[in-house]
Amino acid sequence: MPRSKGRRKEKTANFAGIPRWVIDTPAYKSLDGSAIKLLVLLAYQYKGKNNGDLTITHSVLKEYFKSNTTMYRARDELYKKGFIDFNAYGGKSFDGRKMSSLYALTWASVDDFIKLKKNCYRLTHLAIGKEPTVYFVKGGHPNPKNTKQKKAQYKKDVKKANVKHEKN
């Protein structure tokens, strides 16, 4: 029988992964059921190189959430507890189209905004940085009042030792 030359015969299936150390945190254990569902759906959207380009809209997630209210309440809970962060706020683009807000998972590093395909006509972009912030380990999001405070908070958090996590 000839030896394999490193090619796979079958493609492996994609999966939605949340690291075990994230699930073991007290913040994850305190999440509502709809927030856990939304977090799994965001992990499903995350393909490894698009963190910061994840969307939460009812038109995309309507088969999972029956109402806007439940979905946006789950989004707010994930933000307050530090599992997601805003990468860009929604609104109008340069050519007048509606754009959805973009989100990033805080346990993974944020990918380059320039390379993300949904942002060709984006008016606002919050540079949240590339390093993972892992706010959920500390018990919640710091909730700065403006972009300048957000950047300062991010720089301070990345320097702290408790932001770095140990991968299993």
Label each region the model flagged:
Residues 45-109:
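Winged helix-turn-helix DNA-binding recognition segment
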Residues 21, 27, 34, 45, ...:
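A generic structural signal for solvent-exposed, polar alpha-helical segments
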Residues 1-10, 109-168:
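Charged low-complexity intrinsically disordered patches
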Residues 11, 24, 35, 42, ...:
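A general marker of short, structured functional hotspots
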Residues 27, 57, 74, 119-122:
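Terminal low-complexity, poorly structured segments
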Residues 17, 58, 67-70, 74-79, ...:
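Append "and, occasionally, other polyanion-binding protein interfaces
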